[in-house]
Amino acid sequence: MIFFFSDNHYNTHAGKNIFQNLPCDLKEKVRFFEDDLTVLEEGSWEKECDLLILHLIGGTCSLPHPGSGAEGAVKRYCERKGNMLLLHGSSAAFWQWQWWREITGVRWVRPNDPDGVERSTHPKAPCHVEVCKCRHPLCGELENFDLPEDEIYIDLEQTSPVSCLMTCDVNGKTYPQCTSSFTPWGGEVINFIPGHKEECVSNAALNADIARAVRYLL
């Protein structure tokens, strides 16, 4: 079973749109929750979870930051080498937990970061997202795509060794937009960062790449 927890992401409902655009054979394996942390907090989902997908930034969208029940379940999942797909800014899903801040590979840094790291930024511009020359297995499957003007999440903190799978250029500088890393317990983390507005998360190639990442991680 895939568990997919999302917020409304400032009323864009990006996570919900991504879920709805999954191929039917994947969608039927997903339990999706938007703006509802009850199951995440209750914790029993962890025993059934084959893949954890997040489109969530803790403490935003009028939701509380997930608490101790969620923390225990997420850590148990990670400790049994669970894989994760972190969409958009979800490296900050649980940014108040110190151990979480250290395991996501790259990290969207919130204002007033507990570690004192300078906040990440999101300039708005059209962008071309390009697959890297990398021997990671996913790079042989991913495809390039172009997005209209949208927030581009950049200036992330690197918290562990990563393979960069996709990048985009902003003002002459190249930034990661998809990365692979591993938790201390051996689970793989794919950060897939592009996509905010509805017209961007409805992009066919973006959705195809997300579906490829899901299949790879299962």
Functional labels for PLM-detected ranges:
Residues 36-41, 69-72, 173-178:
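Alpha-helical scaffolding within the catalytic cores
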Residues 25-29, 48, 116-186:
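Catalytic beta-strand/loop cores that center a nucleophilic Ser/Cys/Thr
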Residues 4-6, 87, 192:
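Short hydrophobic segments within beta-strands
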Residues 1-51:
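Aromatic-Pro/Gly-enriched surface loop or interdomain linker
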Residues 184-218:
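Extracellular ligand-binding/catalytic regions of CAZymes and related secreted enzymes
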Residues 11-13, 40-41, 61-62, 86, ...:
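Short catalytic/ligand-binding loop motif for oxyanion handling, primarily in non-cytosolic enzymes
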Residues 51-55, 189-191:
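Structural motif
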Residues 62-137:
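A glycine-rich, often tryptophan-bearing local segment used as a flexible ligand/cofactor-contacting loop or short
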